[in-house]
Curated annotation (Swiss-Prot):
PANTHER family: NAD KINASE, NAD KINASE 2. This is NAD kinase 2. SUPFAM superfamilies: NAD kinase/diacylglycerol kinase-like. Keywords: ATP-binding, Cytoplasm, Kinase, NAD, NADP, Nucleotide-binding, Transferase. It is an enzyme of class 2 (transferase). The keyword Kinase applies. It catalyses: NAD(+) + ATP = ADP + NADP(+) + H(+). Belongs to the NAD kinase family. Pfam families: NAD_kinase_C. One of its GO terms (biological process) is NAD metabolic process. The active site is at 52 (proton acceptor). The keyword Cytoplasm applies. NAD(+) binds at residues 52-53, 124-125, 151, 153, 164-169, 188. It comes from Bacillus cereus (strain ATCC 10987 / NRS 248).
């Protein structure tokens, strides 16, 4: 981090108020040899100011850059999964940086291809949900194997870091980010003699390919979720999901591991 001194700050809500609060921090950073940029193009460190949702937006809006470090500053009551620093204690963060008390961790992403025409990455999860009050039908394939036919409200495919988010609310497993994999969870599946699914989340390793083929039954206009954004596509035939080679490098304090965050948040 000490060698990455071109900083771009990404703000969520209340930008004007937060920029004003960050001005003393800007001065401290500049006094310590950092340069504050107005555009992310020439930045080698991108800092989100807000919450985890702001961090996800910062990564997406700056193109999932692999040549940058990402860091999160929380403006909420406490630090969170993607925010290792708090806006009221950035001076402590600077001390940690100068003492080399921070580490760089890499978070995996998933790559999604929709009908061979639209592709994107997700840091947390990709979701495919019915856009109307009606179930839809999806044929699920793992690699070249037809695996199951799902009928229900939707499917969620999460990364290990995303396993603590939407996935966890669906009773999915919390997965260590050091394991290269992705997880598939169901939203209100209908199981009967015609449609039968595994009925539980399942985890695929980094070499697997997941293909979701929608049945053209009049409900093939789903809502596609990319982390905390929705993608507008009129009609979908299939979505292909893989674990991407692209990883996001983030800054972490040495005493703030993924499992310490899980413990602090849920236990």
């Amino acid at each position: 981090m000490a060698d990455r001194r071109n900083l771009f700050f990404f703000y969520g809500d209340d930008k004007a108020k937060l920029v004003e609060k960050m001005k003393p921090i800007y001065r401290i950073l500049e006094e310590n040899g950092f340069t504050i940029l107005d555009h992310p193009k020439n930045a080698n460190a991108i800092v989100s100011v807000g919450d985890d949702a702001t961090f996800l937006q910062a990564v997406r809006k700056t193109g999932f850059r692999e040549d940058c470090l990402y860091a999160g500053i929380s403006t909420k009551d406490e630090i969170s999964f993607y925010c290792d620093f708090h806006i009221d204690h950035v001076d402590i963060a600077l001390q940690e940086i100068t003492k080399n008390e921070i580490e760089v961790r890499k978070y995996p992403t998933i790559e999604v291809d929709v009908d061979g025409s639209t592709s994107f990455h997700c840091l947390n999860e990709f979701s495919l949900r019915s856009s109307i009050i009606k179930t839809f039908v999806v044929d699920v394939h793992v690699d070249n194997l037809y695996f199951e036919t799902f009928r229900g409200d939707g499917l969620v495919v999460s990364t290990p870091t995303g396993s603590t988010a939407y996935n966890k609310s669906l009773r999915g497993a919390v997965v260590d980010p050091l394991i290269p994999c992705f997880q598939v969870s169901e939203l209100a599946s209908l199981n009967n003699n015609t449609y039968r699914t595994l009925g539980s989340p399942f985890i695929l390793n980094h070499e697997r390919t997941l293909t979701l083929k929608l049945r053209p039954d009049g409900n093939d206009y789903p809502v596609i979720g990319m982390d905390n954004e929705a993608l507008s596509i009129k009609q979908v035939e299939k979505a292909v999901v893989r674990l991407s080679d692209k990883q996001i490098k983030t800054v972490k304090l040495k005493n703030n591991s993924f499992w310490e965050k899980v413990q602090r948040t849920f236990l």
